[in-house]
């Protein structure tokens, strides 16, 4: 089938003409018109000849414009239209066809892409596309059948044949030339999870393998996030060794998030150290220019800048001094593109779409010239495209002598791209551009592979003869097996000797441990209760008891010292596995003042040390601490714990966990019951590594109860496998819960009044977040903030144990916590007869302190007041946007003149008490009152997004409604009218002065808000345009009336508005008074003044009866 060019007029009355489809046999025949009859013949005689009419060639541009936002940024509509306009202008000079361009959407899923290709080929004479490689081969066959010229631009490895023209960008050829030049044969591909990129990866791997390269791995990111990137990179790291990783996804330079996550994950996994080269695939389809502009995405990410040092960018080349952005700028200057188009937001893929349309047009022109201006077929157009040479968007397209690709690399600073090599895929050449390549850390390029991979006539086996490879393989395997066997045997024998006897003995039996039973008790009863209750037993009592352990025995004597036994779950433990011995040996090597020492593994019930018949006891033996667990200590209310005591215990806990984390040990079971306190009140962490031992012994842990899980981090609650192993971030969360126990001296989450099951369910499945509540009077603010950081929902937001240690030390400002002094002080308090008096004075002091704190928080914001109490300086703070409220009393000067001073004070007190009660219901802050002026702000000191405008507007409506019914006690017949002005904008807030400090606001926003009030009217809320915009954006139904142009002193003339209500606001609003011509807007009229007060006013202000 052929694509014919018909006269644009078509048949009489037919309108625009589209390309007609003819059978193959019609090529040898003359196109026949339908018989028009006599009227038609007369009309045909009047028509000009077909050659005098322009013809139409309809081009379809197919791509995922609607489903992929980064493809849509190429503005394919503008690119295709610009190409068509220029083509029509140029072709009109030589009588060529007129081009029409149709933008056709291609779904991002493969099945939809095939349907889009089939539909497109029935509507156009030439097709640019598709993008999905899975649709490329079907598109070639369908285009061949339909006789439509096809110009692919997203199909790596496509060969020109039939009606299919060469690809606009020969991606596979260009990549092969680059890999051959550096002899990088072993490559791996990582694709984004979308169908389009998965198919592109498959097509590219097929094309590279067809050229003889050993593509080691083609993998896809399962999800478009950091975890998906890490999993894909892990498969490459654990797979066969490769030199190059090709990233088949949107480039990070165009905003591709998948490639960003991939490079950041590669940096974290140390894969960007120079051992691998990362090549982006999509940059082969458009032209990037050297310079700093391309790296704008790295401005706020030093990690991404470092990772991109391992990336080489192969991209299409523009002529020297030219770029896609320059061409876009010239087109806009010539008004070929909209003037309001933001060129920086346009993807360089714009030029590729433009070039594809121009290449197709060049083929049409050459085909028409070859047949003398006649009609042409799709095959002839495709054939001529292969030989065409046209002027592209930023350079010459087709067969040129200049390289069509350029290799870009970053310098050592990673601040801009440099051209290092020029590449010609047609000639297969690569030559230097003058700038050397820079690899990470200034190291060399990855080593080359054998050259045989790039020689089609040689079967490549890595450059070594197969026989030698086989012999070497056998030798290496034999030596490795022999060495492994000897090492295992010697290690096993040595370990067995060390564990069985000597100072490093770890396997303990009944001959080593003496167990405790109460005097006179039966053999089945043992000591119950907390660890601290065992401290009263003497060594002689212990040694007099028969050595027969029972199931609940957990305390004994070993080498004259108290020991504690932590039993393994289950029964019938007849032997200790070698893996358990190895794991315990590593745990026993942990020595720290705040980590309980592991002494050995106790085993009873074997043939050598029989216990109760049918039972086998396996337990971890550790040092025993006389004071019991931290949980027991907190439960003993007779022990008074001040902050020094608490901070000492917490600091010991943090030190112990910090040591474990430095040794790579995640506790996983940290709770207050696993923190023990010795006789010197030193806290030690115990039960660490218990999960490792259970796993090595292949013992299933007992299912934890809800109460035992109160210390567990939310991510561990959601993943039981993580909960068994434990994580470092999970230990930080558990530490925060223990801090709450110590600070509040209560069980975890006790203040929430929920059952443990309810707490676990809420912690596991937010929102809302479920965390303990700690008041500021129970601990320093820094301690509460540290707790809040440690129990953050996301593990990566929690501080490390090192940072936690530094932050906690800073709470006491470097003072050392001496727990012995604290104990002595407490003992003195117990023995002193002044205890009651001290308690009474302390309570009085606390009450006075609370009064002072309340008074201070009424004068200053709580955060500022707290900072002043802590003795720290309060730095001024900049707020990007707040809303200010100003109001005053109309005619206040007149009212003051008619009133006694005490009556004025009563008036202001009554009015401001009313205002204060109203603002308590809104998220606002009262700044100050000066005379009759009342100033309120929202959005500071606590930011609340854009709600500040709505909060002030609602408060203003409530105040205005309340003032309507307010009356002065001494002049109830005189109305109290107020003027209100609102304005939004930035300001700076800070504390001014040391004596009677004030929290003041500064900035032009304050002046403008004051001007809005002073130019307002009685019973009116005067709103500036800045506040109106925010209220309209919030869309909460605020009703405003335009006042018109208003002159603001020092600001000029601006448009202002009246706020008159809000949808759903049903409170009455007083009606503004009617203004008489010539009357003042800011005073009280003579008629409103009572006669008895008017005389006083006449004496105070002769001849003046109105005014403020």
Curated annotation (Swiss-Prot):
Signal peptide range in chain numbering: 1-54
Means of activity regulation: Activated by GUCA1A when free calcium ions concentration is low, and inhibited by GUCA1A when free calcium ions concentration is high. Negatively regulated by RD3; RD3 inhibits the basal and GUCA1A-stimulated guanylate cyclase activity.
Keyword Signal: yes
GO MF annotations, alphabetized: ATP binding; GTP binding; guanylate cyclase activity; protein homodimerization activity; protein kinase activity; protein-containing complex binding
Protein EC: 4.6.1.2
Disruption phenotype: Deficient mice exhibit abnormal retinal cone cell morphology, impaired cone and rod electrophysiology, and severe retinal cone cell degeneration. GUCY2E and GUCY2F double knockout mice does not show any photoresponse, their rods and cones degenerate and the intracellular transport of some phototransduction proteins is impaired.
Short name of one Pfam family: Guanylate_cyc
Glycosylation site list: 300
Modifications after synthesis and translation: There are 9 conserved cysteine residues in sensory guanylate cyclases, 6 in the extracellular domain, which may be involved in intra- or interchain disulfide bonds.
Domain of life: Eukaryota
Domain Protein kinase: 491-811
InterPro entries: A/G_cyclase (IPR001054), A/G_cyclase_CS (IPR018297), ANF_lig-bd_rcpt (IPR001828), Cyclic_nucleotide_synthase (IPR050401), HNOB_dom_associated (IPR011645), Kinase-like_dom_sf (IPR011009), Nucleotide_cyclase (IPR029787), Peripla_BP_I (IPR028082)
Residues in compartment: Cytoplasmic: 491-1108
Listed transmembrane segments: 466-490
Any Gene Ontology biological process: cGMP biosynthetic process
Membrane topology value: Single-pass type I membrane protein
Main location: membrane
Reactions it catalyzes: GTP = 3',5'-cyclic GMP + diphosphate
Domain Guanylate cyclase: 883-1013
Additional detail: The gene name nomenclature of retinal guanylyl cyclase 1 is confusing; for mouse the gene name is GUCY2E whereas the gene name is GUCY2D for human and rat orthologs.
Quaternary structure and interacting proteins, as annotated: Homodimer; requires homodimerization for guanylyl cyclase activity. Interacts (via C-terminus) with RD3 (via C-terminus); promotes the exit of GUCY2E from the endoplasmic reticulum and its trafficking to the photoreceptor outer segments. Interaction with RD3 negatively regulates GUCY2E guanylate cyclase activity.
Protein name from the UniProt record: Retinal guanylyl cyclase 1
């Amino acid at each position: 089938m052929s694509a014919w060019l018909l006269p644009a007029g078509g048949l009489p009355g037919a309108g625009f003409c589209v390309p007609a489809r003819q059978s193959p046999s019609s090529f040898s025949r003359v196109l026949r018109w339908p018989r028009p009859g006599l009227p038609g013949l007369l009309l045909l005689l009047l028509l000009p000849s077909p050659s005098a009419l322009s013809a139409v060639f309809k081009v379809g541009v197919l791509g995922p414009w609607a489903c992929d936002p980064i493809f849509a940024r190429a503005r394919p509509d503008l690119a295709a239209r610009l190409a068509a306009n220029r083509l029509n202008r140029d072709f009109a000079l030589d009588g060529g066809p007129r081009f029409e361009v149709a933008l056709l959407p291609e779904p991002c899923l493969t099945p939809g892409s095939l349907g889009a290709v089939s539909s497109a080929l029935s509507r156009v004479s030439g097709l640019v596309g598709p993008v999905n490689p899975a649709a490329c081969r079907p598109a070639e066959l369908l285009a061949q059948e339909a006789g439509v010229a096809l110009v692919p631009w997203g199909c790596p490895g496509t060969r020109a044949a039939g009606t299919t023209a060469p690809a606009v960008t020969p991606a596979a050829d260009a990549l092969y030339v680059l890999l051959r030049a550096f002899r990088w044969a072993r490559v791996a591909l990582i694709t984004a999870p979308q169908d389009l990129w998965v198919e592109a990866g498959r097509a590219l791997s097929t094309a590279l393998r067809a050229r003889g390269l050993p593509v080691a791995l083609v993998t896809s990111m399962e999800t478009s996030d950091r975890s998906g990137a890490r999993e894909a990179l892990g498969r490459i790291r654990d797979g066969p060794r490769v030199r190059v990783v090709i990233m088949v996804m949107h480039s990070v330079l165009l905003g591709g998030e998948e490639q960003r996550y991939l490079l950041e994950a590669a940096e974290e996994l140390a894969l960007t150290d120079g051992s691998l080269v990362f090549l982006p695939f999509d940059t082969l389809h458009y032209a990037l220019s050297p310079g700093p502009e391309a790296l704008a995405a790295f401005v706020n990410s030093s990690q991404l800048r470092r990772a991109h040092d391992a990336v080489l960018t192969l991209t299409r080349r523009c002529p020297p001094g030219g770029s896609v952005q320059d061409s876009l700028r010239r087109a806009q200057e010539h008004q070929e593109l909209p003037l309001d188009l933001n060129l920086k937001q346009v993807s360089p893929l714009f030029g590729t779409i433009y070039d594809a349309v121009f290449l197709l047009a060049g083929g049409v022109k050459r085909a028409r010239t070859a047949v003398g201006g006649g009609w042409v077929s799709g095959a002839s157009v495709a054939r001529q495209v292969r030989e065409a040479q046209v002027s592209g968007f930023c350079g010459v397209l087709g067969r040129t002598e200049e390289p069509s690709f350029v290799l870009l690399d970053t310098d050592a600073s990673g601040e801009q791209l440099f051209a290092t090599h020029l590449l010609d895929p047609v000639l297969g050449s690569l030559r230097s551009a003058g700038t050397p390549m820079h690899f990470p850390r200034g190291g060399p390029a990855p080593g080359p592979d054998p050259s045989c991979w790039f020689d089609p006539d040689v079967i490549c086996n890595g450059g070594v003869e197969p026989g030698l490879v086989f012999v070497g393989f056998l030798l290496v395997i034999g030596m490795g097996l022999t060495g492994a066997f000897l090492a295992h045997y010697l290690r096993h024998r040595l370990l067995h000797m060390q564990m069985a006897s000597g100072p490093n003995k770890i396997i303990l039996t009944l001959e080593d441990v003496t167990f405790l039973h109460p005097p006179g008790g039966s053999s089945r009863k043992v000591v119950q209760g907390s660890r601290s209750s065992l401290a009263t037993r003497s060594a002689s009592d212990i040694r007099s008891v028969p050595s027969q352990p029972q199931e609940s025995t957990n305390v004994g004597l070993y080498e004259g010292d108290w020991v504690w036994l932590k039993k393994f779950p289950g029964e019938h433990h007849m032997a200790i596995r070698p893996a358990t011995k190895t794991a315990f040996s590593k745990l026993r090597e942990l020595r720290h003042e705040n980590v309980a020492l592991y002494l050995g593994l106790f085993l009873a019930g074997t043939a050598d040390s029989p216990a109760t018949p049918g039972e086998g006891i396996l337990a971890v033996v550790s040092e025993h601490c006389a004071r019991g667990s931290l949980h027991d200590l907190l439960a003993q209310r007779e022990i008074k714990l001040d902050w020094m005591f608490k901070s000492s215990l917490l600091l010991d806990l943090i030190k112990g966990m910090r040591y474990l984390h430095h040794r790579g040990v995640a506790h996983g079971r940290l709770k207050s019951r696993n923190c023990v306190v010795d006789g010197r009140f030193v806290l030690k962490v115990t039960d660490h590594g218990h999960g490792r031992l259970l796993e090595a012994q292949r013992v299933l842990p007992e299912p934890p109860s809800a109460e035992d899980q109160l210390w567990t981090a939310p991510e561990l609650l959601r993943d039981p496998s993580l909960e068994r192993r434990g994580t470092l971030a999970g230990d930080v969360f558990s530490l925060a819960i223990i801090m709450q126990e110590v600070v509040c001296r209560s069980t975890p989450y006790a203040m929430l009044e929920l059952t443990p099951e309810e707490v676990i369910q809420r912690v596991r499945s937010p929102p809302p977040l479920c965390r303990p509540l700690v008041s500021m009077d129970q601990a320093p603010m820094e301690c509460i903030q540290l707790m809040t950081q440690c129990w953050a929902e996301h593990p990566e937001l929690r501080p490390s144990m090192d940072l936690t240690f530094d932050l906690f030390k800073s709470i006491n400002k470097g003072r050392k916590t001496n727990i012995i002094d604290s104990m002595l002080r407490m003992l003195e308090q117990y023995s002193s007869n002044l205890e009651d008096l001290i308690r009474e004075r302390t309570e009085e002091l606390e009450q006075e302190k609370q009064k002072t704190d309340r008074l201070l928080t009424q004068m200053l914001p709580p955060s500022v007041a707290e900072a002043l109490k802590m003795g720290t300086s309060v730095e001024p703070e900049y707020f990007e946007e707040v809303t200010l409220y100003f109001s005053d009393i109309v005619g206040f000067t007149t009212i003051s003149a008619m009133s006694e001073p005490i009556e004025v004070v009563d008036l202001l007190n009554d009015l401001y008490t009313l205002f204060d009660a109203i603002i308590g219901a809104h998220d606002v802050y009262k700044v100050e009152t000066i005379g009759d002026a009342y100033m309120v702000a929202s959005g500071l000191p606590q930011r609340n997004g854009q709600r500040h405008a709505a909060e002030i507007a609602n408060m203003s409506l409530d105040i205005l409604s309340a003032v309507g019914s307010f009356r002065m006690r001494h002049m109830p017949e005189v109305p109290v009218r107020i003027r209100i002005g609102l304005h939004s904008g930035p300001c700076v807030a800070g504390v001014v002065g040391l004596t009677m400090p004030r929290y003041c606001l500064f900035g032009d926003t304050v002046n403008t808000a004051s001007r809005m009030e002073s130019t307002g009217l009685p019973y009116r809320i005067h709103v500036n345009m800045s506040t109106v915009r925010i209220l309209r954006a919030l869309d909460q139904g605020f009703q405003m009336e335009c006042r018109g142009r208003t002159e603001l002193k020092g600001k000029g003339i601006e448009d202002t508005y009246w706020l008159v209500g809000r949808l759903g606001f049903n409170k009455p609003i007083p009606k503004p008074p009617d203004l008489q011509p010539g009357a003042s807007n800011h005073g009280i009229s003579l008629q409103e003044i009572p006669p008895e007060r008017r005389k006083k006013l006449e004496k105070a202000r002769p001849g003046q009866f109105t005014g403020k």
